Amino acid sequence: MNGFTVVIPARMASSRLPGKPLADIAGKPMVVRVAEQAAKSRAARVVVATDHADILAACAAHGVEAVLTREDHASGTDRLAEVAAKLALPDDALVVNVQGDEPLIQPELINRLAELLAGADAPVATLAHALHDAADHFNPNVVKVALDKHGRALYFSRAPIPYARDAYAADRSALPAGLPVYRHIGMYGYRAGFLAAYAGLEPGPLEQYEALEQLRVLWHGYGIAVALADEAPAAGVDTPEDLERVRRLFA
């Protein structure tokens, strides 16, 4: 699958790591490292979407395309919608969202997501991988997704879905054999035309209570195609400790 566009949202504000996109990793800002990884995929174009002039300047200094967006977007998807409009992408263009704090993102995952979206009858696509640890199933910081038999998302939740009623009544320390438990990987692919529609969709109560923006898509009746990845993506950078770990890998 070729010809898709990768958009990397990069905001300067971060509660745990201020100025995160510009954090130095072996002589380059983190957002540039992310863009370099994305460029190893089969994307035709890699664009950073930022709300800060310093990030825009850093991208320009390293030859990375970037666009300046508004600061007041409620979600990353809303920011993508603005970018798709600014780039005048046609409605059938494929847009893959890669987070700006994942300098180790595997290009193969980006390609897999673009391939899924290209062949899907849904306007949104994402990835998941199998969970094998009951502690993760019950962890609200681990987002789970339940799928139908066609590989489309039925629901995303921080709760343990699907819940094995009888098995868990006896023992919650292990996942029952055969229970289809999948962890959502927070990467998305969109058709550009849907992004324009998404910007006008009101948040629903499911999204607000679960704090999961993808539930807005399901709430309004749109489908989300899901492909299973063999492994989780490399860990992103959320804390100073994460940053030091990544710096050691680039040293």
From Swiss-Prot:
InterPro entries given in the database record: Cytidylyl_trans, KdsB, Nucleotide-diphossugar_trans
Catalytic activity: 3-deoxy-alpha-D-manno-oct-2-ulosonate + CTP = CMP-3-deoxy-beta-D-manno-octulosonate + diphosphate
Main location class: cytoplasm
GO molecular function, one term: 3-deoxy-manno-octulosonate cytidylyltransferase activity
Subcellular location: Cytoplasm
Annotated EC: 2.7.7.38
Enzyme class, first EC level, given as a word: transferase
GO CC annotation, single: cytosol
A biological process term (GO) from this entry: CMP-keto-3-deoxy-D-manno-octulosonic acid biosynthetic process
CDD domains per record: CMP-KDO-Synthetase
Pathway(s) per entry: Nucleotide-sugar biosynthesis; CMP-3-deoxy-D-manno-octulosonate biosynthesis; CMP-3-deoxy-D-manno-octulosonate from 3-deoxy-D-manno-octulosonate and CTP: step 1/1; Bacterial outer membrane biogenesis; lipopolysaccharide biosynthesis
Chain's role: Activates KDO (a required 8-carbon sugar) for incorporation into bacterial lipopolysaccharide in Gram-negative bacteria.
Family: Belongs to the KdsB family.
Name of the protein this chain belongs to: 3-deoxy-manno-octulosonate cytidylyltransferase
Species, as recorded: Chromobacterium violaceum (strain ATCC 12472 / DSM 30191 / JCM 1249 / CCUG 213 / NBRC 12614 / NCIMB 9131 / NCTC 9757 / MK)
